[in-house]
């Protein structure tokens, strides 16, 4: 098979949702259909010990939440599928945002009882900004939920995206009978030995069922007043195909997967800092690091840099350029993943995700190129933390482990490090409280370094150019610090302190991140 044919087989997507909408469960079912697992771990895992296969970190298994992005790959129906299962918890949205830079489509999982929730809305805005296709799976039809028409209306009003139902539920909860499949022109039955039936058999199967009569009325209404199906509108991110189903009972999931792969896009190009777009079919290898993860295998204390292959083909042992440093690197020890399990990979093509063993060479956002190519891809989003804590080693004899742990966990990008200009104290910044809890848990469990953390409350953060800095600008209303790249930064007590500073130093430019 030619390189172009291999690339065109790739389908790389992320699954996004609010916590508890069923994202991890549907990921498990997709892996089940891909033949990667014999049984899907379920949300019952916290009690049974039968943990989700895509949740590998110890704290994820304890709490039943996803706080890191997992990468999984399988072959299905002539396609090579790359799934990125993202953190649903809001405190880890920064990791999710970066992951969304590495995919060509997104699957949005919505709880049928709750509709569009806060985190779903935030993540959708990032997806919308990138203009990548969004496929919606409305989950938990095995439970009572909201009216399907209400859910479609909410998609359009809250998210501002047109929707087109690919199937329609017949009943819900205890009255759930199956799906009216508009796309495949068939019925998918929830009970009984036969899974599918023709639409002509509907009256015989459901003739006296009031829910079936309601379905026919709804479908007639949608035909008159609903949106038209358009494959181009899907690819442009203007129309979301909507699928109903139940991930927990594995109903409607395979139909979703089949139809998703029919319409999901091939790998797309990525913009460079100069505005050029690198074509995935370009034979020269290029890629970017969108995530760094320490201790995926705690026995080996390893670090993996996750790379999205943007163009061409990776071959094991190849030499690459790292434009940020002006140096080169050799990609010898490279893996692909199924959650925590991994295997060495000899080659990969545009659209694939590979894991490069990292000894401190890479940073999130790094571009990798070959030959004379020295371009860099557009930078990944970074976020200004909102809450802060002082952190120190509980045991002074563990300083070496403490510094190693802090360095590696901060490089993952889920938490940010600052150093007080005057005192040298370490301070951590995060978007939410859970990030601190995970940091403390991992420092103790993975680096054997207990930490003491003291809350500093919320701060307003602004960066300042080194040439504008005067240490006399520091006052009781702010803390002067350095970030992990040694760039000067002020942590202001509040917005009033920021305005006071801006009035006092009108010529000093303060920069805010996303």
Curated annotation (Swiss-Prot):
One GO CC term on file: cytosol
This protein's UniProt keywords: Cytoplasm, GTP-binding, Nucleotide-binding, Protein biosynthesis
Major subcellular location class: cytoplasm
A Pfam entry, by short name: RF3_C
Binding positions (GTP): 17-24, 85-89, 139-142
Cell location: Cytoplasm
Top-level taxon of the source organism: Bacteria
Ranges where the tr-type G domain occurs: 8-268
InterPro entries in the cross-refs: EF-G-like_DII, EFG_III/V, G_TR_CS, P-loop_NTPase, PrfC, RF3_C, RF3_dom_3_sf, RF3_GTP-bd
A Gene Ontology biological process term: regulation of translational termination
GO molecular function terms noted in the UniProt entry: GTP binding; GTPase activity; translation release factor activity, codon nonspecific; translation release factor activity, codon specific
PROSITE patterns named in the record: G_TR_1, G_TR_2
Homology family: Belongs to the TRAFAC class translation factor GTPase superfamily. Classic translation factor GTPase family. PrfC subfamily.
Function (record text): Increases the formation of ribosomal termination complexes and stimulates activities of RF-1 and RF-2. It binds guanine nucleotides and has strong preference for UGA stop codons. It may interact directly with the ribosome. The stimulation of RF-1 and RF-2 is significantly reduced by GTP and GDP, but not by GMP.
HAMAP family: Rel_fac_3 (MF_00072)
UniProt name for this protein: Peptide chain release factor 3
Organism: Streptococcus suis (strain 98HAH33)
Gene name tied to this protein: prfC
């Amino acid at each position: 098979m030619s390189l172009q044919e291999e690339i065109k087989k790739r389908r790389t997507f992320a699954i996004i949702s609010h916590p508890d909408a069923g994202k991890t469960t549907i990921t498990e079912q997709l892996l089940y259909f891909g033949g990667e697992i014999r049984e899907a771990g379920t949300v019952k895992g916290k009690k049974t010990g039968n943990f989700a296969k895509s949740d590998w970190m110890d704290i994820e298994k304890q709490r039943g939440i996803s706080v890191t992005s997992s990468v999984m790959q399988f072959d299905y129906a002539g396609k090579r599928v790359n799934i990125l299962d993202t953190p649903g918890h809001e405190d880890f949205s920064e990791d999710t945002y970066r992951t969304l830079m590495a995919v060509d489509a997104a699957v949005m999982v919505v709880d049928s009882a709750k509709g569009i929730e806060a985190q779903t809305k935030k993540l959708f805005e990032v997806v919308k900004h990138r203009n990548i296709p969004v496929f919606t799976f409305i989950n938990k039809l095995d439970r009572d939920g909201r009216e399907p028409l209400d859910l479609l209306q909410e998609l359009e009003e809250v998210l501002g995206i047109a929707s087109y139902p690919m199937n329609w539920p017949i009943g819900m909860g205890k009255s759930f009978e199956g799906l009216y499949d508009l796309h495949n022109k068939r019925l998918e039955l929830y009970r009984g030995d036969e899974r599918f039936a023709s639409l002509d058999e509907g009256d015989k199967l459901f003739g006296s069922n009031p829910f079936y009569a309601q379905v026919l009325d709804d479908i007639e209404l949608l035909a008159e007043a609903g949106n038209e199906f358009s494959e181009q509108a899907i690819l442009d991110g203007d129309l979301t195909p909507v699928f109903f189903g139940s991930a927990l009972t594995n109903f409607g999931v395979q139909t979703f997967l089949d139809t998703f792969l029919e319409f999901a896009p091939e790998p797309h190009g990525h913009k460079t800092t100069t505005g050029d777009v690198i074509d995935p079919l370009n034979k020269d290898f290029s890629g970017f690091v969108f995530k760094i993860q320490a201790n995926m295998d705690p026995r080996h204390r390893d670090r993996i840099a996750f790379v999205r292959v943007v163009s061409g083909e990776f071959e094991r042992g190849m030499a690459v350029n790292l434009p940020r440093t002006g140096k080169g690197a050799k990609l010898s020890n490279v893996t692909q993943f199924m959650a925590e399990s991994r295997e060495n990979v000899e080659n990969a093509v545009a659209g694939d995700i590979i894991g490069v063993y990292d000894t401190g060479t890479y940073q999130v956002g790094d571009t990798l190129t070959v030959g004379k190519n020295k371009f860099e891809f557009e930078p990944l989003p970074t976020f200004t933390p909102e809450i802060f804590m002082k952190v120190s080693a509980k045991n002074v004899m563990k300083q070496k482990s403490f510094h190693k742990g802090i360095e590696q966990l901060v490089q993952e990008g889920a938490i940010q490090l600052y150093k007080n200009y005057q005192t040298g104290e370490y301070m951590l910044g995060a978007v939410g409280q859970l990030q601190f809890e995970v940091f403390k848990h991992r420092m103790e469990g993975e680096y054997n370094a207990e930490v003491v953390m003291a809350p500093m409350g919320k701060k307003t953060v602004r960066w300042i150019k080194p040439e504008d800095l005067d240490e006399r600008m520091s006052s009781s209303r702010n803390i002067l610090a350095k970030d992990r790249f040694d760039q000067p930064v002020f942590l202001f007590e509040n917005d009033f302190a920021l305005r006071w500073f801006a009035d006092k130093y009108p010529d000093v430019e303060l920069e805010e991140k996303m």
